[in-house]
């Protein structure tokens, strides 16, 4: 599972997922999976999508993961009264804004890439689209 090796603070405020995305262009591979909606991806969802893509391309080509879960999400145990401090860190998420390229792929044909990204998109909670690298 993806998570930071060390952080400055163990727990963070909830905050809001606003703003515009960085990393909106396909930069490493030839094909990409771009977010259309806004949301957050857990480390488990990122890994599930990666596994689906890897199986679909039969370990050919190369896959880049352009998102990293760096925000800790806390939860209180079941049947615990409110108060008594913030809960324990349960999982890590990556905040996604519209336009962010989340995955990239190279070394496979476009049909294979489209199929692999379709399988990966089914594992993700946000709407996505298939993009290709624009050559200047």
UniProtKB/Swiss-Prot annotation:
PANTHER family, sorted: 50S/60S RIBOSOMAL PROTEIN L16, LARGE RIBOSOMAL SUBUNIT PROTEIN UL16M
Keyword tags: Ribonucleoprotein, Ribosomal protein, RNA-binding, rRNA-binding, tRNA-binding
A single BP term in Gene Ontology: translation
InterPro entries: Ribosomal_uL16, Ribosomal_uL16_bact-type, Ribosomal_uL16_CS, Ribosomal_uL16_dom, Ribosomal_uL16_sf
MF terms in GO: rRNA binding; structural constituent of ribosome; tRNA binding
Function: Binds 23S rRNA and is also seen to make contacts with the A and possibly P site tRNAs.
Gene Ontology CC terms, in alphabetical order: cytosolic large ribosomal subunit
Keyword Translocase included in the entry's annotation: no
Protein name, UniProt field: Large ribosomal subunit protein uL16
Complexes and interactors: Part of the 50S ribosomal subunit.
Family statement: Belongs to the universal ribosomal protein uL16 family.
């Amino acid at each position: 599972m993806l998570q930071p090796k060390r952080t400055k603070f163990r727990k963070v405020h909830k905050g809001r997922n606003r703003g515009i995305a960085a990393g909106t262009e396909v930069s490493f591979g030839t094909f990409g999976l771009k977010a259309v909606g806004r949301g957050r991806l857990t480390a488990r969802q990122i890994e599930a999508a990666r596994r689906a893509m890897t199986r679909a391309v039969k370990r050919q080509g190369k896959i880049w993961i352009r998102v990293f879960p760096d925000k800790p999400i806390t939860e209180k145990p079941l049947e615990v009264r409110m108060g008594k401090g913030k809960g324990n860190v349960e999982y890590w998420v990556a905040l996604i804004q519209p336009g962010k390229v989340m995955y990239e792929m190279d070394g496979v044909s476009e049909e294979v890439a489209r199929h692999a990204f379709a399988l990966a998109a089914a594992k993700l909670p946000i709407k996505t689209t298939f993009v290709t690298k624009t050559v200047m």
